[in-house]
From Swiss-Prot:
CDD domains: C2_PLC_like. The active site is at H178, H223. Transgenic mice, where broad ectopic expression is forced, initially appear healthy and their oocytes undergo unperturbed meiotic maturation to metaphase II but subsequently exhibit autonomous intracellular free calcium oscillations, second polar body extrusion, pronucleus formation and parthenogenetic development. Transgenic males remained largely asymptomatic, whereas transgenic females develop abdominal swellings caused by benign ovarian teratomas. It is found in: Nucleus; Cytoplasm, Perinuclear region. GO terms for biological process: calcium ion transport; egg activation; intracellular signal transduction; lipid catabolic process; positive regulation of cytosolic calcium ion concentration involved in egg activation. The EF-hand and C2 domains are essential for triggering Ca(2+) oscillating activity and the regulation of PLCZ1 enzyme activity. The X-Y linker region between PI-PLC X-box and Y-box domains may be a target for proteolysis and may play an important regulatory role during fertilization. PANTHER family: 1-PHOSPHATIDYLINOSITOL 4,5-BISPHOSPHATE PHOSPHODIESTERASE ZETA-1, PHOSPHOINOSITIDE-SPECIFIC PHOSPHOLIPASE C FAMILY PROTEIN. It comes from Mus musculus (Mouse). Its EC number is 3.1.4.11. The production of the second messenger molecules diacylglycerol (DAG) and inositol 1,4,5-trisphosphate (IP3) is mediated by activated phosphatidylinositol-specific phospholipase C enzymes. In vitro, hydrolyzes PtdIns(4,5)P2 in a Ca(2+)-dependent manner. Triggers intracellular Ca(2+) oscillations in oocytes solely during M phase and is involved in inducing oocyte activation and initiating embryonic development up to the blastocyst stage. Highly expressed in postpuberal testis, where expression is sperm cell-specific. Also expressed in brain of both sexes. Residues 386-502 form the PI-PLC Y-box domain. This is 1-phosphatidylinositol 4,5-bisphosphate phosphodiesterase zeta-1.
Length: 647
């Protein structure tokens, strides 16, 4: 009897929602599409057309209310959702409050759930008032809950800034872009303000500005010696000022590639000061005279990264003085060992360092006399006004690890090209991690990438490089990893590096085949696909799901499902995969949906989603999908089950 009452209540509710649209008798496919949205179940029009055609029995392009209900049930009352619902109900019609709590604790691992939480879920998602009033949930409410943001794969607490933000800047991975002003290739592509706006909205915290002398004493931004278009420096700065803290409160670093004359450098300094005002960091913080401040201490601050002459104390003493026309000579004395990248065992390295220190104390000018050390000089004129705006991010050429350990100051940052960084990460891994534990290190794409392609950033995160700069305008795997990694910590653009990359006494080596420190065993069941994107080449694509793990080399693995033929609307797999992840703190997981097109043409990417392994919820979860360009493809998603434990 109770079951029949609930069925009647559900029928009355459904009729009340749709009957007005059927006053004319039948509806077409466009109204069907809108009505599904009205019922809180938006659907891709391509899928609506397909299901509409299957249910239009008379092939008139119009359907009855019964035919619409069949379409609605096909979309909402999915078999895999109904099976879960039935497992926790006695009559397969209604989920009690206690049964909902049982489901949430046993299946979703919501261990702190209580009656007030379950009532809140019922009130939020149950659309049938009679059922809601009894603190129960129908399949309608349960389906709405399972398809809601609360059941997404990404952990809710990872959507907030939950990490300790009081460590020095060098203790964080920092979301960084390369050639931010470009929105295409590096030879003919246009420069555009949108490059900066888009990067900042995505949470990027380090922007590159390539500055050159312009006409009428107006510095310009473009990729020098190419045919890329030009932007006014002041226009770029104004855009940054508007969007700098829209997504994140934490500091923005402006990495200046400065090719300007002293006169136009002075103009740059004036523009920076007048535009940013108090947001521009122009003096050291009192509590951080000789150590890097934290992101928390630098909230809402703009930092300038550029060459600098003199010390922070000298800069402090000049505050308030007139610097017009004053030019400083920047000198770079480069000491290089003969074979920079050759391996050096720790004992030999310590002897080498001791020798440098002894020579330095005795007579700095004799350093070049050490066997194997070469010396050369470089000079450049810098406007004092611009030099004095560089505080905690002084650009300093990277010579080698030995030199940095002896000479490098706490506020000096290095930029290393990808090829050299890759070589160092393989041959000098311990020294590299020791270096990045102390100094901010930026890795940038090699010059040969004229098409603005990117490298895999994971290999440099593995050795602690803070600023792994990518071409944000170029979609693909590297940017998927970038976007996925920086979803963490509230999308703030700052992620605290794990202990193994901050504490050098741990002796971490990402290249070791095994790292026995509480690995994670991860099990994922790919259950089904929900309204997957339609292929550009076929309305009935053959779908495959690929799971990829990126992290230290030993954790890099790829597994895939079987191919489901001719079904993008609701393909089903029910396939289980297990992964052993040695260093989960550095691991990202990527879900890829492709359509199989044959050996010659290759697979077509339909959607993907990347996130940190430790940001995954357990239980039945929905994986949102994003296009190659990063567009959200909702309601396209995967329905999966996740379980993992740490040894």
């Amino acid at each position: 009897m109770e079951s029949q009452l609930h069925e009647l209540a559900e029928a009355r509710w459904f009729l009340s929602k749709v009957q007005d649209d059927f006053r004319g008798g039948k509806i077409n496919v466009e109204i069907t599409h809108k009505l599904l949205e009205k019922l809180d179940f938006p659907c891709h029009f391509a899928h609506v057309k397909h299901i509409f055609k299957e249910n239009d029995r008379q092939n008139q392009g119009r359907i009855t209310i019964e035919e619409f209900r069949a379409i609605y049930r096909c979309i909402v009352h999915r078999e895999e959702i109904t099976e879960i619902f039935n497992t926790y109900t006695e009559n397969r019609k209604i989920l009690s409050e206690n049964s909902l709590i049982e489901f949430l604790t046993q299946e979703q691992y919501e261990m702190e759930i209580d009656h007030s939480d379950s009532v809140e879920i019922i009130n939020k998602y149950e659309p049938i008032e009679e059922v809601k009033g009894e603190r129960q949930m129908s399949i309608e409410g349960f389906a709405r809950y399972m398809f809601s943001s609360e059941c997404l794969l990404f952990k809710e607490n990872c959507k907030t800034v939950y990490q300790d933000m009081n460590h020095p800047l060098s203790d964080y991975f920092i979301s960084s872009s390369h050639n931010t002003y470009l929105i295409s290739d590096q030879i003919l592509g246009p420069s555009d303000i949108w490059g900066y706006v888009s990067a900042l909205v995505k949470g990027c915290r380090c922007l590159e500005i390539d500055c050159w002398d312009g006409s009428q004493n107006e510095p310009i931004v473009y990729h020098g010696y190419t045919f890329t278009s030009k932007l006014l420096f002041k226009t770029v700065v104004q855009a940054i000022n508007k969007y700098a803290f829209v997504t994140s409160d934490y500091p923005v670093v402006l990495s200046l590639e400065n090719h300007c004359s002293p006169g136009q450098q002075e103009v740059m300094a004036s523009i920076l000061q007048s535009t940013f005002g108090d947001f521009l960091l122009s003096d050291m913080l009192e509590e951080f005279p000789d150590t890097l401040p934290s992101p928390e201490a630098l909230k809402f601050k703009i930092l300038v990264k550029n060459r600098k002459v003199g010390t922070l104390s000298e800069t402090h003493e000049r505050i308030g003085t007139d610097k017009s026309g004053q030019v400083l000579e920047w000198k770079e004395v480069i000491y290089e060992d003969g074979d920079e990248d050759s391996g050096m065992d720790p004992e030999t390295w310590d002897v080498f360092l001791s020798r440098i220190k002894e020579e330095r104390e005795a007579d700095p000018s004799t350093l070049s006399g050490i066997a194997g050390v070469k010396k050369r000089k470089r000079k450049m004129k810098i406007a004092m006004a611009l030099s004095d705006l560089v505080i905690y991010t002084k650009a300093e050429k990277f010579r080698n690890f030995q030199y940095s350990r002896v000479y490098q100051q706490f506020n000096e940052t290095n930029s290393i090209g990808e090829s050299r960084a890759r070589k160092l990460s393989k041959l000098r891994v311990h020294e590299f991690i020791f270096h990045t534990a102390a100094f901010i290190t930026r890795v940038y794409p090699k010059m040969m990438r004229a098409d603005s392609s990117n490298f895999n950033p994971q290999e440099f995160w593995n050795v602690g490089c803070q600023m792994v700069a990518l071409n944000f305008q170029t979609p693909g795997l590297p940017m998927d990893l970038q976007n996925g990694k920086f979803l963490d910590n509230g999308g703030s653009g700052y992620i605290l590096k794990p202990d193994i990359l901050r504490d050098t006494t741990l002796g971490f080596n990402p290249n070791e085949p095994e790292y026995d420190d509480h690995p994670v065993t991860l099990t994922i069941r790919i259950i089904s696909g929900i309204q997957l994107p339609v292929s550009s080449s076929s309305n009935t694509p053959d779908i495959v799901v690929i799971i990829e793990v990126y992290g230290v080399p030993n954790d890099h693995v790829k597994q895939q499902t079987r191919v489901v033929k001719n079904n993008a609307f609701s393909p089903k797999w029910n396939e289980t995969f297990t992964f052993l992840i040695q260093v989960p703190e550095l691991a990202l997981i990527r879900f890829v949906v492709e359509t199989q097109q044959g050996l010659l043409s290759g697979n077509e990417l339909l959607g993907q989603y990347t996130l940190p392994v430790l940001c995954m919820n357990k239980g039945y979860r929905r994986v949102p999908l994003f296009s190659k360009s990063g567009a959200n493809l909702e309601p396209s998603s995967l329905f999966i089950y996740v379980w993992y434990f740490r040894e």
